[in-house]
Amino acid sequence: MSRINITKKIYCSVFLFLFLFLSYISNYEKVNDEMYEMGEMDEIVSIVRDSMWYIPNVFMDDGKNEGHVSVNNVCHMYFTFFDVDTSSHLFKLVIKHCDLNKRGNSPLHCYTMNTRFNPSVLKILLHHGMRNFDSKDEKGHHYLIHSLSIDNKIFDILTDTIDDFSKSSDLLLCYLRYKFNGSLNYYVLYKGSDPNCADEDELTSLHYYCKHISTFYKSNYYKLSHTKMRAEKRFIYAIIDYGANINAVTHLPSTVYQT
């Protein structure tokens, strides 16, 4: 066998050895990284589980893990029930491993339902990339309508990068369907939410607003002093000025005047 052939075989053997060795190292590091990440997720679950004395059914994994904290619900519970401390070890782990922009009922919506909600924490979360203001539930309603903390100031923070609400045309409808917050109604209307957006029964924002007024004053007729409903009239004028159709008809059929 010639010296050249022997040299070629040696080079091939060395190359094969290096290739296999580097592949092994790469896979080893990958496995170690995955195990490390799983270890940190387990740590998050452990901390949250040890701090929770009760787990509402809404946070169960579709009933599969009832009564248990899991990787699927741990971040939701953290942002809903915990006093979020941005300097804590737990917060840093959550930021590192949780999907802050999970579609549906996301960490953002959970945090806006937190009774210890803090605008400064919200700003930090947004700085970390939280961006799913417009997520909707299975019925097509905005999750933010369930918030305990939303007001004009919080809306400004959440929508700082959004020029208008034209892509969330039903936001005003959602709020007037479930809430009766005068200043926020103006805010959403002025931002561009469609006043003629209708639900499955063809009820528009104006229908719901008139229903709120009717129900509220019927139930409080003997408790309140005489009022000319100046504030309510102002909003009705405003929503009409922004294009609300006062002749919109529902499936019943009924108009705004018959609501």
From Swiss-Prot:
InterPro entries: Ankyrin_rpt, Ankyrin_rpt-contain_sf. Transmembrane segments: none annotated. Gene3D superfamilies: Ankyrin repeat-containing domain. The N-terminus of this protein is hydrophobic. Belongs to the orthopoxvirus OPG003 family. This is Truncated Ankyrin repeat protein OPG003. The gene is OPG003.
